[in-house]
A protein has these predicted regions:
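S-adenosyl-L-methionine
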Residues: 91-141
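Conserved S-adenosyl-L-methionine
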Residues: 55-59, 81
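Glycine-rich SAM-binding Motif I of class I
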Residues: 61-65
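A short glycine-rich, Lys/Arg-flanked "PGG" loop and its adjoining helix->strand segment in the class I
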Residues: 160-175
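Conserved beta-strand signature within the Rossmann-like core of class I S-adenosyl-L-methionine
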Residues: 146-148, 175-183
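Core SAM-dependent methyltransferase catalytic element
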Residues: 195-218
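A short SAM/SAH-binding and catalytic strip from SAM-dependent methyltransferases
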Residues: 145-159
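Rossmann-like AdoMet
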Residues: 1-51, 69-99
């Protein structure tokens, strides 16, 4: 499938799939979306001193890298990705420049260079395990404080936004765990509610009116 590098409205890059008319990050700003959806609406709400995070769709590593930049605590990060991006695509991402994070360049490069299926200590306070796995094969239980649900949109891959998948997400979270996603589709919200989540509609990132935050309240 054809893949192109696209510059989004905040100046940061994303990968565009023209055959699907879909992007890895919002055309209205890759970095803006990460901060709004995953950091400000997710990470900043977790009170634990050591935070376990599951990312559904590791992709370009942007959410992981910004989590590293913004975390004021110990992070245990698991990124799941069925189809990893290539080293050539990673090199074309301009996140370091736009974030003015030249001092952390080696961290971003290390996140992509480390092997899959093994836990690596990226820094003293940040560990990373990358799993090459289909989302429907996730079987974690009571393991995570926070899930970044960043799969391709329901228009393109509706099977990833089903009750079956969100039931797996519910099981994977600890009690009072949080799932955040850029999507606000009614069908997605209903699927979340059906498996037991408490769901909030929140103001969306640039270009989107709303987003969803789901909490596992027992």
């Amino acid at each position: 499938m054809k893949r192109e590098i696209l510059v989004t409205s905040d100046g940061s890059t994303t990968i565009h799939l023209p055959d699907l008319d879909e992007q890895y990050h919002s055309k209205n700003g890759s970095i803006n979306e990460t901060y709004h959806v995953f950091i400000n609406s997710g990470l900043k709400l977790v009170s634990a001193e050591k935070v376990s995070i599951l990312e559904i769709g590791f992709g370009t590593g942007l959410n992981c890298f910004i989590t590293y930049l913004e975390a004021k605590k110990v992070i245990d990060y698991v990124g799941v990705e069925a189809y990893p991006v290539t080293p050539e695509e990673v090199e074309k991402m301009n996140f370091i420049k736009v974030l003015k994070a030249e001092k952390e360049r080696t961290i971003f490069e290390k996140m992509h260079a480390v092997s899959w299926e093994e836990k690596h200590q990226i820094s003293e306070t940040f560990s990373l395990l990358k799993r090459k796995q289909l989302f429907e094969n996730i079987e974690d239980e009571d393991a995570f404080h926070l899930i970044y649900f960043d799969a391709f949109g329901a228009r393109v891959q509706p099977e990833l936004w089903s009750e079956e998948i969100f039931r797996k997400m519910f099981k994977a979270l600890k009690e009072n765990g949080i799932l955040v996603t850029y999507s606000a589709k009614g069908s997605v919200r209903r699927a979340m509610l059906a498996v037991g989540f408490t769901v909030e509609r929140l103001p969306g990132p640039p270009g989107k009116r709303e987003m969803l935050r789901a909490i596992k309240k027992l």
